[in-house]
Amino acid sequence: MTTSINSVVTVFQNVFTNHGSTLLNGILIATTVGGQSLVRKLTFSCPCAYPLNIYHSLVFMFGPTAALLLIGITVNSTTWKLAHGFFFRVRDTRHSWKTTCVSWIEVLIQSSVAPIAWLFVVFLDGGYYRCYRSHEFCLISDAILCKNSTILNSYASTSSFNKISDNGKYCPPCICVPNPTDASYLEAESQIYAWGLLLFSGVAAFLVITCNRMCDKYTLVQRQYVETYKNVETQKFDAVAKEHASQLAEHNARAFFGQKDWTKRDWDWVSGIPEVNNPLFARLRLIAAEKTQQTMYTPLQLWNDNKGYRIPQPDLQLTQIIVDETKED
């Protein structure tokens, strides 16, 4: 039984390792489609007013598009690898303009999946686009609803009639309930745009991926090995970092609690919050290198340094690394 469970887990791990981005995009698209349907049913209602119908439709069409794009950029790890510490990188480690531009393009492309899915579903639905253009088919002289004097007078008697009809040019009730023939025409046009967007996005994605892989200096098998190495390296780095941080934190904590008693000053030291503008806990300064060879990250470390305690470095069982001493720092 245990063997079967392990086999299933292994299969899922392999699937996510090899096709993780594809599965993630699929889940993202499905979530976007479901979210659009929910928004359409619960919140969207075309207003019987011009030009409010235009603004209302555009907000629902492109507002979530911009939000999804921004969220995609925010959650992309490459964004923060490029941005984090940008102004304080050592000159030799700064990314070249070529690398920066290519990386940002990749981030934008990866973040465009959900926005494009949203636009596709929005145009395929047709309701938003119909509302956006319905006033074009609702001239007050032609609209059937406004030929009914009772309906027209009920709108004309309101103080906002001139605002919602562009001074009597459009028929307000027709904007939110257009003629069925006109509504069908607008919905069909919207769906054409939807499939055109999908076709264009698919072709563009295929061409970009193809060109990128054709220009890759690695073969497919070698690229798979490189990606495997990157993943394993990240896992190992995190594991060793946790071990190192755990030992260092334990040494600092034992130094603090190894005292017989503590003054209020001691507790004030370890209760601080690192702030950029605070000279005591300045992140940018990181306790200048001339004071200590060990970078300080937390108030507890600062307290130990202020006390003059020498905290031993973590003793990690690492494979011996041969350093080329002919290279200058």
UniProtKB/Swiss-Prot annotation:
Any one GO molecular function term: voltage-gated calcium channel activity
Spans within the Cytoplasmic topological domain: 1-14, 75-103, 213-329
CC terms in the record's Gene Ontology section: monoatomic ion channel complex; non-motile cilium; plasma membrane
Any one Gene Ontology BP term: calcium ion transmembrane transport
TM spans (from-to): 15-35, 54-74, 104-124, 192-212
Glycosylation sites: N148
Disruption phenotype: Uncoordinated locomotion with mutants showing reduced forward velocity, muscle force and power production.
Extracellular side stretches: 36-53, 125-191
InterPro entries hit by this protein: CALHM (IPR029569)
Tissue expression: Expressed in head and body wall muscles, IL2, ASG, ASI, ASJ, PHA and PHB sensory neurons, and spermatheca.
Function according to Swiss-Prot or TrEMBL: Pore-forming subunit of a voltage-gated ion channel. Permeable to monovalent cations, divalent cations and anions with selectivity Ca(2+) > Mg(2+) > Na(+) = K(+) > Cl(-). Acts both as a voltage-gated and calcium-activated ion channel. Required for normal locomotion.
Protein name: Calcium homeostasis modulator protein
